[in-house]
Amino acid sequence: MAEKTYPMTLEEKEKLEKELEELKLVRRPEIVERIKIARSYGDLSENSEYEAAKDEQAFVEGQISTIETKIRYAEIVNSDAVAADEVAIGKTVTVQEVGETEEEVYHIVGAAGADVFANKISNESPIGHALIGKKTGDVATIETPAGSYDVKILKVEKTK
């Protein structure tokens, strides 16, 4: 069975590599040291410092594993390979909900680069999924748990 690929820009992959390095070279050794210190307190059955450090260790190891998988199966997307006015990972899209006047600007990224506070939406999100492959002037239907709505694509450009 083929592994799932993770579409992302080169910048997103580099960001993941830096995060992985931070986890392996900084966080992991810090946690190991905390576990060592907590063990020195004696009885582990009622040692909250030890339990907290072990929980954090499990969390960090899970993050490391997830990031390693995403990097291993990264599919680097070149937004230059699609038409200039076509929505793809690495593009910035300006849309307007049909019947409304306010415009929204989204940066389409792979799941690893999503950041709603910076308007970076994943290609796997309801909005990203509906917009991928559409072109300037197209209308896309966004399906969300709260219902659906239509947006018109006003502008597509390469993310700077």
Swiss-Prot record:
GO terms for molecular function: DNA binding; RNA polymerase binding. GO terms for biological process: DNA-templated transcription elongation; regulation of DNA-templated transcription elongation. Residues 1-31 form a coiled coil. Keywords: Coiled coil, DNA-binding, Transcription, Transcription regulation. PROSITE patterns: GREAB_1, GREAB_2. InterPro entries: GreA/GreB_C_sf, TF_GreA/GreB_CS, Tscrpt_elong_fac_GreA, Tscrpt_elong_fac_GreA/B, Tscrpt_elong_fac_GreA/B_C, Tscrpt_elong_fac_GreA/B_fam, Tscrpt_elong_fac_GreA/B_N, Tscrpt_elong_fac_GreA/B_N_sf. It comes from the Bacteria. Necessary for efficient RNA polymerase transcription elongation past template-encoded arresting sites. The arresting sites in DNA have the property of trapping a certain fraction of elongating RNA polymerases that pass through, resulting in locked ternary complexes. Cleavage of the nascent transcript by cleavage factors such as GreA or GreB allows the resumption of elongation from the new 3'terminus. GreA releases sequences of 2 to 3 nucleotides. Belongs to the GreA/GreB family. This is Transcription elongation factor GreA. It comes from Streptococcus suis (strain 05ZYH33).
